[in-house]
A protein has these predicted regions:
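Active-site and donor-binding regions of nucleotide-sugar-utilizing enzymes
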Residues: 5-8, 14-25, 65-121
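Short N-terminal binding/cap micro-motifs at the start of the first secondary-structure element
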Residues: 13-16, 42-44
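Nucleotide donor/acceptor-binding cores
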Residues: 2
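Conserved nucleotide-sugar phosphate-binding/catalytic loop shared by glycosyltransferases and other
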Residues: 32-75, 85
Length: 121
């Protein structure tokens, strides 16, 4: 059985990924691994990881990456936190591949970590 880790960091892209998540979840030859990060874990953004749980999905890993600062240095530090957390999550979950969606800087540490760990994206 192939383990597919879907990484979601915001409600906006979760809405688009939900159909992919649902197909993976129901496929008998695939095992869904759900990793949430970014805005999903932010009280200021409504702790939207709860919406994912309300949709009936188990969250396999929560990777905190947000600092209160949105200056360049704060963003760089957040990206570093994300790399560390993703490394731990990938090491624990051992996914066969990851699925991401987006075009923002938050994806850089996710895909960078997967690349270094030789996990197909």
């Amino acid at each position: 059985m192939k383990k597919i880790a879907v990484v979601t960091g915001a409600r906006s892209e979760y809405g688009l990924l939900r159909w992919v998540i649902d197909e993976i979840h129901h496929a008998t030859e695939l095992q869904l691994q759900l990793i949430v990060t970014g805005g999903h874990l932010s009280p200021e953004q409504g702790l939207t990881y709860r919406c994912i749980e309300e949709d009936g999905y188990d969250i396999d890993a929560k990777v905190d990456m947000l600092l209160s600062s949105d200056c360049a240095s704060g963003i760089a530090k957040s990206m570093g936190m994300c790399s560390i957390g993703m490394s731990d999550a990938f090491l624990h979950l051992q996914p066969d591949m990851i699925v991401v969606l987006g075009d923002r800087y938050e994806l850089l540490p996710i895909v960078g970590t997967a690349l270094v760990m030789r996990i197909p994206i």
